[in-house]
């Protein structure tokens, strides 16, 4: 009876160890990726775009090749807006790819929506790489 209880208690630890191993294998590291950020609020017409930046040692998801930890990069931009520009509660979007050409194409497409002829009255501002830089997020354990 005591052995059965001991085995039942050890089973979750074994499952957790296996899940941790699988999580490590979910992501893989690439030398670099390209990304830009977009920050907006529903309370005003201010729109912010970062430059297209190269970020070294980026992790991608193994299944689809998406940026792993994308929310962490969005929080980097959100924290910058809150702390440096004193603009709280910004909704931030990160667009990324391992190919610079793909990111630049998406950048131009988004810019057309907010700066083009059909754009509404938005106050579009740019955040240069000298003011804000994305930092790689270690996703090896997640």
Predicted feature descriptions by range:
Residues 1-21:
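Bacterial Sec-dependent N-terminal signal peptides
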Residues 18-24, 78-83, 110-112:
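Intrinsically disordered, low-complexity boundary segments flanking structured domains
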Residues 18-71:
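N-terminal secretory signal peptides
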Residues 41, 100, 127-129:
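Generic structural motif
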Residues 62-89:
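Short, glycine- and small/hydrophobic-rich beta-strand elements in well-ordered beta-sheets
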Residues 74, 78, 100, 104-111:
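Extracytoplasmic/secreted envelope proteins and their assembly/folding machinery
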Residues 88-101:
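A short, exposed loop/beta-hairpin motif centered on an aromatic-Gly-Thr core
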Residues 109, 113-142:
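C-terminal partner/receptor-binding element of secreted or periplasmic proteins
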């Amino acid at each position: 009876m005591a052995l059965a209880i001991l085995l039942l208690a050890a089973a979750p630890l074994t499952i957790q160890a296996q899940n941790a191993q699988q999580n490590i294998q979910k992501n893989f590291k690439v030398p670099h990726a390209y990304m830009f950020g977009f920050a907006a609020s529903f309370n005003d017409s201010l729109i912010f775009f970062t430059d297209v930046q190269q970020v070294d040692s980026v992790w991608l998801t193994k299944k689809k090749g998406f940026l792993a930890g994308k929310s962490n990069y969005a929080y980097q931009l959100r924290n910058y807006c809150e702390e440096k520009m004193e603009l709280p509660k910004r909704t931030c979007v990160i667009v990324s790819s391992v190919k610079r050409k793909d990111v630049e194409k998406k950048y131009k497409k988004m810019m057309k929506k907010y700066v083009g002829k059909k754009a509404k009255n938005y106050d579009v501002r740019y955040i240069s790489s000298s003011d804000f830089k994305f930092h790689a997020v270690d996703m090896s354990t997640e």
